[in-house]
Amino acid sequence: MLSPKRTKFRRYHRIRSKGTANCSNTIVFGEFGIQALTCSWITSRQIEAGRRAITRYVKRGGKLWIRIFPDKPITFRPPETRMGSGKGAPELWVSVVRSGNMLYEILGVSEVTARGAMRIASYKLPVKTKFIKKVKN
């Protein structure tokens, strides 16, 4: 699973993700990609599940870029714990995704293959997505 090697703080606030993405909202590396249409947290397990679905569908052809990284720790308290005694321990890592963020990009496969791979990967994610093709200038 993806997680940062080190962070400045162990615990962070749970910010609300709303609005549109100002950066990483266009295709930069690949030729095809999927873009988020809604806001959500995407966990490292969901990112990995999407990556596996894409690589298995294209049968190790092409190059894949993951444009999001889970850099935010989410903490949970143990069940039936009394109030107080601080914040819980970090349990999972999430990436804050806003509408317009590019999630995955792929290069070196046909459009039909890329569309099928991205469709399967989108089923693994908690956001609505759309398939994007790079505009040739």
UniProtKB/Swiss-Prot annotation:
Matches recorded under InterPro entries: Ribosomal_uL16, Ribosomal_uL16_bact-type, Ribosomal_uL16_CS, Ribosomal_uL16_dom, Ribosomal_uL16_sf
Gene3D superfamilies per the UniProt record, alphabetical: Ribosomal protein L10e/L16
Gene Ontology MF terms: rRNA binding; structural constituent of ribosome
Keyword Ribonucleoprotein: yes
A single GO BP: mitochondrial translation
The keyword Chaperone is annotated on this UniProt entry: no
Name of protein: Large ribosomal subunit protein uL16c
Gene this chain is encoded by: rpl16
